[in-house]
UniProtKB/Swiss-Prot annotation:
InterPro entries: UDG_fam1, Ura-DNA_Glyclase_AS, Uracil-DNA_glycosylase-like, Uracil-DNA_glycosylase-like_sf. Gene3D superfamilies: Uracil-DNA glycosylase-like domain. It is found in: Cytoplasm. One of its GO terms (biological process) is base-excision repair, AP site formation via deaminated base removal. Its EC number is 3.2.2.27. It comes from Clostridium perfringens (strain 13 / Type A). GO terms for molecular function: uracil DNA N-glycosylase activity. The keyword Hydrolase applies. SUPFAM superfamilies: Uracil-DNA glycosylase-like (SSF52141). GO terms for cellular component: cytoplasm. Belongs to the uracil-DNA glycosylase (UDG) superfamily. UNG family. Excises uracil residues from the DNA which can arise as a result of misincorporation of dUMP residues by DNA polymerase or due to deamination of cytosine. This is Uracil-DNA glycosylase. Coiled coil: none annotated.
Amino acid sequence: MAAEFNNDWDDLLKDEFKKEYYLNLRKFLINEYKTQKIHPSMYDIFNALKFTPYKDVKVVILGQDPYHGPNQAHGFSFSVKPGVQTPPSLRNMFKELNSDLGCYIPNNGFLESWAKQGILLLNTVLTVREGQANSHKGKGWEIFTDRVIELLNKREEPIVFILWGRNAISKEALITNPIHKIIKSVHPSPLSATRGFFGSKPFSKTNDFLVSINKEPIDWQIPNI
C-alpha cells in the first residue's frame, strides 16, 4: 500500500508514504483488508494516479469515496468495472453529456478512456467497507488526497477542476493558483441533479477552456462494450 505509480507521481508523493499519518493509515488498511470486505481491490486503490501522470493531467473530477457495492469500484471516481450496471450519478452524468455534447448514452460505466486522456478521476477517500458508505472517512486518506490537489495547484500548466457537490466544493480552498479553471455545481446524484447539475454544461465548458489554452479537447464519448 506504499504505491509505485510508475510515473512522475512516484517522486512527487514519495515523502507522503513515510509520514506518520500514512503509516497509521497503512496499518489500518492492512487489518481492514484482512478482516473485512473492502473496495476496491488493494491492487486498484491508486489507479487514478497510475493511469494519469502528473504532467498529463488536464482535468480533475473529484469524487467522495468509492462505490461500496460488490465489483463496482476500481480506483477511479464515478467509474465502474465493465459488466456492472451504471450507478445513478453516472447515469445522470451521461444524460448531461448527451444534452451538452450529443454523446450517446453508453451501455457501461467504465471510464478508463477518460483517465487515459488526462482526466484524473480522484476520490477524496480511496477505500471503503462493502455496504458502508464513508466507513474509511477520517482515517488519513483526506490528508493524502489534499496533498495531491495541492501538488496539482502548484502546476504551471492550467488544469480544469470539476467540483460537484458540497464535499468536492470544500476542496476549492486548496485551489489558489489563478491559472486553473474551476467548474462547480450540485452533485449529479438523483437527490440533487435537478437543482443545477442538469443544464450546467460542464463537459463543453471544459473543452472550451482546453481549446482556449491550445490543448486537445477531451473525447467524452464512452464507447459501448
